[in-house]
Amino acid sequence: MPNSIIKKYPSKGKLFYVIGASGVGKDSLLHYARQRLANESLVFAHRYITRPVELKGENHIQLTKEEFNNRLQRGCFKFNWHSHELDYGIGVEVDRWLMQGSNVVINGSRGYLNTAVALHPGLVPVLIQVDSNLLHERLIKRGRETLEQIEKRIQRAQAFVGLTSPNMQIIENNSELSVAGEQLVSLLRNQAVKIL
């Protein structure tokens, strides 16, 4: 599948690229931060995914495979990747928000990190981590995957142990949601470009 058509725009805002293994609590942490930072100069971008929308979990825009490919061919995605038999995209609207001075938070992919950094060198990677035993427990509890799929996700998580990138920020999510949630809120507030 071809990569998205990329146009580089001057960025006044900062791009935060939140990543972590399935089950580390990214969706919960992003939801927590979105509520706490609702009145600040941060925009939480939605993802376009070839997965049905669920009542609990990520608030994304569901696309069929055909719709996704159509948007990909038309250059509608700033970032796009394929993982766990699904296609994911971040829309080019993110560039407009950044150009207008908004700070933008996106739910990214560890496997796409190097490409994202190459396309947007100033982005801030935020890695959410959790102990491996807790990760397995959370994947079972959320009930979204089969046991075989859970095992594949655990193996993929192990493949990314030691992931590094310039300016990488790390948040451990091994206790109450509010602990890691407040760390994420503080990080976003402190590193966001202040709009005068």
UniProtKB/Swiss-Prot annotation:
GO terms for molecular function: ATP binding; ribose 1,5-bisphosphate phosphokinase activity. One of its GO terms (biological process) is organic phosphonate metabolic process. Coiled coil: none annotated. It is an enzyme of class 2 (transferase). Its EC number is 2.7.4.23. The keyword Nucleotide-binding applies. InterPro entries: GK/Ca_channel_bsu, Guanylate_kin-like_dom, P-loop_NTPase, PhnN. It comes from the Bacteria. It catalyses: alpha-D-ribose 1,5-bisphosphate + ATP = 5-phospho-alpha-D-ribose 1-diphosphate + ADP. Keywords: ATP-binding, Nucleotide-binding, Transferase. Pathway: Metabolic intermediate biosynthesis; 5-phospho-alpha-D-ribose 1-diphosphate biosynthesis; 5-phospho-alpha-D-ribose 1-diphosphate from D-ribose 5-phosphate (route II): step 3/3. Belongs to the ribose 1,5-bisphosphokinase family. Catalyzes the phosphorylation of ribose 1,5-bisphosphate to 5-phospho-D-ribosyl alpha-1-diphosphate (PRPP). This is Ribose 1,5-bisphosphate phosphokinase PhnN. It comes from Psychromonas ingrahamii (strain DSM 17664 / CCUG 51855 / 37).
